[in-house]
């Protein structure tokens, strides 16, 4: 049954209005790689770019430094491409626990309970929220470094790299991170 009554309905509604209809904003490379691996899809099949500010640490340099973009989960007419709309007009995240960490954290409230928030998830309690925040911070810091390293490489490239080249680098760099090995460019340098 899709209907949820009481506080859980309010929680799901606020989550959908804030994130699902607009698409997740604070997605890291680790999130994109985890989704890509699980769905057996290259990241460019479910991501899109948006203009990035000059000082944005997630701004990926493309086209011989003529463009800076953010790479994010794509939006469809109804919001995030993974947002599944029900016949009643409500929605659910089609990724469940695979969703980006920032999506799983929002809108968790310190002191919340772990009762189910509907199919496929639950509200995070304080300990789970703290663990998710630590994971997100580590992923975010790695994402910032990954983008900075890519931007340095892109400036030196003989042919202008595109967003798919960046995402290939992302897949390699995340694999290196998980294996505890050096960055891809440090191995071949």
Where are the regions a protein language model picked out?
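Short loop/turn segments that flank or connect secondary-structure elements
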Residues: 1-189
């Amino acid at each position: 049954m899709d209907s949820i009554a009481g506080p859980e309905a309010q929680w799901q509604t606020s989550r959908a209005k804030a994130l699902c209809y607009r698409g997740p904003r604070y997605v890291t490379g680790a999130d994109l790689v985890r989704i890509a691996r699980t769905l057996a899809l290259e990241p460019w099949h479910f991501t899109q770019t948006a203009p990035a500010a000059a000082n944005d640490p997630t701004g990926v340099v493309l086209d011989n430094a003529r463009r800076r973009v953010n790479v994010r989960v794509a939006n469809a007419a109804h919001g995030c491409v993974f947002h599944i709309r029900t016949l009643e007009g409500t929605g659910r995240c089609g990724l469940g626990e695979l969703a980006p960490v920032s999506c799983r954290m929002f809108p968790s409230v310190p002191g919340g309970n772990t009762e189910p928030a509907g199919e496929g998830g639950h509200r995070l309690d304080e300990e789970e929220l703290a663990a998710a925040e630590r994971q997100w911070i580590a992923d975010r810091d790695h994402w910032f470094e990954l983008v900075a390293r890519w931007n340095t490489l892109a400036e030196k490239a003989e042919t202008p790299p595109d967003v798919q080249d960046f995402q290939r680098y992302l897949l390699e760099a995340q694999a290196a991170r998980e294996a505890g090995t050096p960055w891809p460019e440090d191995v071949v340098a």
